[in-house]
Amino acid sequence: MFAVAATLVIVAGGASACSGGEAGSAPTIAPQETKVTVAGDSIALGLGTAMRDDAEGGPSDGAPLVVRAIGEDGTGLARPDNFDWPGRLEELAADFPPEVLVFSVGSNDAQDLTDETGATVATMADHEAWDEEYRARLARSFDAFADTGTRVVWLGHIRPEDDEVGETNRHIHELATEVAADRDDVIVEDLAVLTGSGADSTSECLSSDGLHLSRDCYSEAAEKLLAGIG
């Protein structure tokens, strides 16, 4: 579990208003909000939406926690010519660094790795080169927040119906765990653990498309992540 200096209380954006009191009483100062950003692909976007919804229904006293989700369908770290997540995270860190960043990709990355021009830099057939390049992209994503005080939470994906996608996203979770091991500001979480589905079978947690999570499993994972943040 991970912690930030705040009590878990959720508001739908903005700080809590100061409460009124009897004349002459000391004013109540609204606690400073804690900003959480969930970033990644459509799976991350679904989780971020569930976290935001769960947060809005949370308790009403203490430090407000505001959840923001930024996601791009069909993206990951494989194709910076399509969407450059490390670059986007560096922009976020420079402009609006949150207290907590939840980053989750992997299920769109069962493919060769390209550079920003679309040229292939590592094929899936060359396992060593692919792993080395993917580790570097994970490291750049994590290190974007090294000087901001942001707590980075890597979130691994569950295994979907497609075997190749499942083997790849579980392998990516292993790579992320390795990269995070020597970074004190990076926490590793796993949807397979948060939902209780396990790393090998996810039939009860998949939606009808065989890739995304069901609403109930998104909600379960969101609740546990928010509890960890609190």
Residue locations for each model-derived region?
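Bacterial signal peptide processing site
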Residues: 19-22
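C-terminal motif of bacterial Sec signal peptides marking the signal peptidase cleavage site
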Residues: 14-17
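Generic structural signal for well-ordered alpha-helices
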Residues: 89-90, 135-142, 173
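Catalytic His-Asp segment of secreted/periplasmic serine-dependent ester chemistry enzymes
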Residues: 158-230
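Conserved SGNH/GDSL esterase-like catalytic core that processes O-acyl groups on lipids
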Residues: 29-129
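Active-site segments of SGNH/GDSL-like serine hydrolases
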Residues: 107-108, 141-171
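Sec-dependent N-terminal signal peptides
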Residues: 1-9
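Extracellular/periplasmic catalytic domains that process cell-envelope and extracellular macromolecules
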Residues: 30, 93-97, 147, 181-182, ...
